[in-house]
Amino acid sequence: MLAKLAALITPKNRRSTPDANVLRGEPPPSIAVFSEHFKRYGLADLLHYESFDPETQLYYNSLNAAFINPKERPKSYGFILEIPPSPGADEEMAKILLGMFNQHYPTGSTIQCCLYASPEIAGMCQAWVGARQSGSIYERMAQRRADYLLKGTRRSLFKDSAAYLVRDYRCTFALMMPGNPDDSDISDALSLRDSLMGVLRAAGFPARVVAPPDLLALVDELVSPAREGDFKHLKPQYDAHVPLREQAVSREVNLQMKEDGLVIGDKAVRCLSVNSYPKEWSLAMTRDFIGDFFQETLQVPCAFVSTIGIQIPDREAMQRMVTLKASRAIQTADSPMAKFLPDLLNRGREWRKVQDDVDSGISLARVWHGVTLYPQLGLADQAESQVKSLYLSKGWKLEVDRFLQVQSFLAGLPGRFDPHLAQDFAQFKRLRTITQFNVVNTMPVLAEWSGTASPLLMLSGRRGQLMFIDMFDNNQGNYNGAVVASSGSGKSFFLNEIVSSVVGTGGRAWIIDVGRSYERTCKLLGGQFIEFTENAGININPFSTIREFDDDELTMLKQIVAQAIASEGGIDDLSMSWIEQAITSVWQDKGNTATFTDIAQFLLTHPDHRAKDMGEILFPYTKNGVYGRFFEGKSTLTFDNDLIVLELEELKSKKELQGIVLLIIMLRIQQEMYLGERNRRKICVIDEAWDLMSGGQATKFIETGYRRVRKYGGAFLTATQAVNDYYKNPAAQAAWENSDWVFMLRQKDESIEQLKASGRFSVGEYLGRVLRSIRTRHGGYSEVYIHMPGGGAVGRLIVDSYTAKVYSTKAEEVHAVNQLVARGYSLADAVEELVRQEEASKHGH
């Protein structure tokens, strides 16, 4: 750690060759020194954070440890940035990031990048709950979900499977320069910061300066992690008149030294360093540092920090060193001895490559890669074993930093890997010399996608990242979506989650269904259930509700009339012209009182016999026709709720009528969306859309409606069981192709092949593997692949027992809730009581 300790931590003190004192059971000198330090001083004395200049936003550091001569206290200055981890990378990103080395750094400067898997998700959960309407059942559902997820931040959320923790990945990027700066140095530092932020931005990492309150909160998390079941609800208060180090560490922090780790509260902190690297690596592969995407057993079972510390060497001195070492290694590799020692040949080849890189202008840097684990007490060995297995599966070898835990722990704190600590690492031979290209490709800047900005849906990634999903956050296109989910994969739960999220945050939702899948949930949530039966007395005359007779309205009315005339086949342009003439004429004459009867009469009086035939075909929908009661007179279809389910099951045997009813309902919903507030979310869900959209004239209607609702802040969401369902008719295909969002739950192989053949979006080898790996764990979660403008991600919908009861389709559970409500329970309390009774019966109470 510190230069004065170099003599105390030599190879003779390592576990492999302990000295006599160690063999007698006494602690090694390094542990003894720190143990003695912690008896008299706190951890704060080992931190260098001194002050912050609000004008320049630079940090000034000075190490204040008691065993350092006050006249020799190492000083540094610099800045700390936070960047959002990227969910992926390519060669172009790596090339852009390489630009960070095209700067003129003072010799000895350090760059540090830390990726922190933070368990502090309480703030995100609170934002999600807080977005729900206060006192509603939706708020209760959100709170129960949040409570459930918060249990999975320190220990696995699922007891009978591999470790799964819920997290929020954060990434910091720091540059520290040696010495006490003058005005010129400060000016250079500010220029460097601007340049680095520009490089990061160009690579897809918009950076922000970490101000003292945020730094104190982050350091507090790392040096004083919350106990299991608790969270950091209060951030440390920043006082510009008190050294930062003293504000960063609570006086209650009790740090204990162990041979292979530290103990802080109920955490057994353990630090590891990279001992050997894979022969080939790319930046995109660093996303596996947080856990294997495909193998559940290769995960990190606790909070952790993955760090790269980079020391900027003297370029000329480094080149001389490379030339010297390369010549020796190459000479040895060419010697007769190398025939018997293959390692010498490999070493020679490696140094020849380094020499060639340097000769071609590629610069070198000295780096350290480390991982700090934060397992619960008693679980450190297990966590160490699992993270070693993860890294080894990728070609990296990790080793525990025995007797060097404090130094490694400090190096994993944001901005703490400074020029002085880097020099100590160099003295202990802990820095590797590699090309700057390799530095960039091993930076821990990748994690899982954290979603969109608004807290609508809340999912979590396979490696635990909590993510918000909101289709209405799409600034690049429309808000429409398509859901593809095979039987048993959790489609109803997922659609219910979308609908309850929209309604719970103050929006409106309509569900058009055949099969009564949403009847019980609708009634349980106090929604409006509209059933189209012979005796329902519902009138849906489309003319009654027209407010503005614009081009879009006319287009959709034409498609409705055309659907009634030719439910399966097509209609030529001439016939569509006659329909338009009829609609325009009757609207001018009767306005909102117009009906299908008026359209039919107009066509029957037309001189062309083909138009007359069309009038005859419309007879079933006129006042004397079999379906006239649905269309004659004023529309009685009203939407009196924020959640409306329209059930078309009874029309299933009357396909020609069902197709017209669907189009009129969609038109009516669009009109409601138009009347609503633009900033209020509005969504219409059509389940088993391919079957409902089988009408021959629906395609143009769908295209117009999908485009139209975007202007009203509305969205359509269709759902089918397989991709090829969307290709069973032109209207369903139009819905598929006009949806910017695609949600794919578990699929059969043939459905994935259909997706690939459709060209809807590119499905290469990797994405194909991702889609085939999508799974549903009953009682645990449903996975969904989310495709949106700009990329894709996998999220898990994890449902708590309370929400599961709300979404239940079991008649006995709905009946039980209704009985409790009749006894005076609120709806939210009734569901709560049902969950309590079930839990009690499980435990025999």
Q: Across the structure, where does each feature detected by a protein language model lie?
A:
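Extended, folded cores of ATP/NTP-driven motor/assembly subunits in large transport
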Residues: 1-444
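Glycine-rich phosphate-binding loop of nucleotide-binding enzymes
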Residues: 60-76, 84-86, 91-105, 197, ...
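Short, flexible loop/turn elements at secondary-structure junctions
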Residues: 85-87, 117-119, 175-179, 375, ...
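Conserved nucleotide-binding/hydrolysis micro-motifs of P-loop NTPases
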Residues: 86-88, 119-121, 180, 515-517, ...
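P-loop NTPase motor domains
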Residues: 94-106, 298, 313, 397, ...
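Short glycine-/polar-rich loops that comprise or flank the Walker A/P-loop
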Residues: 108-111, 506-507, 527, 712-714, ...
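P-loop NTPase motor core of the ASCE superfamily
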Residues: 159-167, 471, 549-601, 724-726, ...
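Anion (oxyanion) recognition and catalysis
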Residues: 201, 392, 503, 523, ...
